[in-house]
Amino acid sequence: MSYGQIRLVETSGASGATSQQDNLGYSGVKASHKMAEIDSGRMSKYKSKINKVGQSYGIEPALIAAIISRESRAGNQLKDGWGDWNPQRQAYNAWGLMQVDVNPNGGGHTAVGGWDSEDHLRQATGILVTFIERIRTKFPGWSKEKQLKGGIAAYNMGDKNVHSYEGVDENTTGRDYSNDVTARAQWYRDNGYSG
C-alpha cells in the first residue's frame, strides 16, 4: 500500500522556534535540512533498522529518519531512552528514538523494546501508519501526499487535532511538526535513505 511520496509533499519547513535548537539564524526548509544533516552522523548507526522497518510497513525510510531526527535528534536528546519530562507527572512522556507517547493522558502506549531497537521502530512506525490511515478515513478527498502530511501531524498530537490541510500544524509542537518532518525527510531521501 502506498502512503504517498514524501518528495511530493508541500512543506514550509521548521519554524524559527524549532531552528533555535541549533542556534540557526534562519527558519524554513533550509533550517530543517541543516538539522537533518547535523543528526545524520548519529542516524547512520540506525540506517539498516530504519530501512528494514520502512520496507516492512511501506513507509519511506527517509520519513522514519526524519521523525527520529525531530523527536530525539537521533537519540542525542534522550536520557536512558526517555524524553519529554513531565514535571506534573514526575515522569517522562515518551520512549525511544521516535518518542512513543507513554503518558496515560496522551497516547497511553506501552513502550516496546529497547529505545534504539528494531522493535521500538516497528511499534512507532505502526503508530504512524495507524494515524495516516485515520487521516485517510477522515479526509478521503485529500491526495495521498496531503493524507501523509496529516498523518505526520497526527503522530505528534493525534488525529482529532487535525481539522484542515491549511491548518495541519496549528496544534502540533512548535506549530510546524509536519512541515519540519517533511522537509527533514526530503533531505534524508536525497542523502541515502531512499529505501
UniProtKB/Swiss-Prot annotation:
Tissue: Ubiquitous.
Temperature-dependent activity: Optimum temperature is 25 degrees Celsius.
Record SUPFAM superfamilies: Lysozyme-like
Keywords linked to the UniProt accession: Antimicrobial, Bacteriolytic enzyme, Glycosidase, Hydrolase
Entry EC no(s): 3.2.1.17
One Gene Ontology biological process: killing of cells of another organism
Active site, per annotation: 71, 84
Molecular function terms from GO: lysozyme activity
Gene3D superfamilies: 1.10.530.10
Keyword Hydrolase: yes
pH dependence: Optimum pH is 6.0.
Function statement: Possesses lytic activity against M.lysodeikticus and several fish pathogenic bacteria.
Family the UniProt entry places it in: Belongs to the glycosyl hydrolase 23 family.
Record's protein name: Lysozyme g
Organism from which the protein derives: Paralichthys olivaceus (Bastard halibut)
